[in-house]
């Protein structure tokens, strides 16, 4: 090869290598390539001085003959008599003859939340309307700011449900929250309704 072809070859190699450093191109790329080009390696040549979980092998002393300490293997029978019968009599005579509702035994919960359906059934709007109906007069008198914030939140959620989530309100009507059933002090079904007026 003559010197002209060699110099041309070196210039081509130089330009292609310089192009390799740039990740912008006038040629449109596929989406995957663009996402990869945006993720830059900023730790090239860096030596980590700590153990990387899942990357580095576990730290071991070289040429150490002492085995790694681990608990002795136990053969566990998951169907032994004690494990198989665990909790089988928990329900016997706990609630008596069935006249006491289980929600009335939830002494650790606030009175207005006892027996109330969870967020997966009755949403925040239903919960706040229930809370407002029970403590409306007390909140007005003792903490007007909290009462005002509660009304604002109910008003916002009511707008949200009326305009964006009408199907959810329909589902909640079928939960039995508004039906006339035997009441258990923790719910006031007669005063709670989705038609409640918001002032």
Swiss-Prot record:
Location(s) in or outside the cell: Mitochondrion
The UniProt record lists the keyword Transit peptide: yes
GO cellular component: mitochondrial large ribosomal subunit
InterPro entries the UniProt entry points to: Ribosomal_mL51
GO biological process: translation
Transit peptide endpoints, chain numbering: 1-15
Cysteine-cysteine disulfides: none
Keywords from the named record: Mitochondrion, Ribonucleoprotein, Ribosomal protein, Transit peptide
Similarity comment: family membership: Belongs to the mitochondrion-specific ribosomal protein mL51 family.
Subunit structure: Component of the mitochondrial ribosome large subunit (39S) which comprises a 16S rRNA and about 50 distinct proteins.
Protein name: Large ribosomal subunit protein mL51
Higher taxonomy: Eukaryota, Metazoa, Ecdysozoa, Nematoda, Chromadorea
């Amino acid at each position: 090869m003559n010197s002209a072809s060699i110099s041309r070859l070196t210039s081509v190699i130089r330009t292609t290598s310089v192009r390799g450093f740039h990740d912008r191109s006038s040629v449109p790329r596929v989406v995957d390539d663009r996402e990869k080009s945006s993720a830059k390696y900023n730790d090239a040549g860096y030596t980590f001085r700590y153990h990387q979980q899942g990357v580095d092998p576990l730290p071991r002393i070289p040429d150490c003959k002492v085995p790694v300490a681990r608990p002795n293997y136990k053969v566990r029978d998951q169907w032994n008599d004690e494990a198989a019968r665990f909790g089988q009599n928990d329900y016997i005579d706990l609630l008596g003859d069935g006249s006491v509702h289980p929600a009335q035994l939830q002494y650790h919960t606030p009175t207005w939340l006892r027996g109330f359906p969870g967020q997966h059934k009755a949403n925040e709007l239903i919960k706040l309307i229930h809370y407002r109906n029970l403590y409306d007069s007390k909140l007005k008198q003792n903490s007007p700011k909290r009462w005002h914030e509660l009304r604002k939140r109910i008003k916002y959620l009511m707008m949200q449900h009326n305009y964006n989530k009408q199907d959810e309100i329909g589902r909640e009507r079928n939960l039995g929250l508004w039906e006339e059933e035997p009441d258990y002090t923790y719910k006031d079904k007669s005063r709670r309704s989705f038609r409640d007026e918001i002032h």
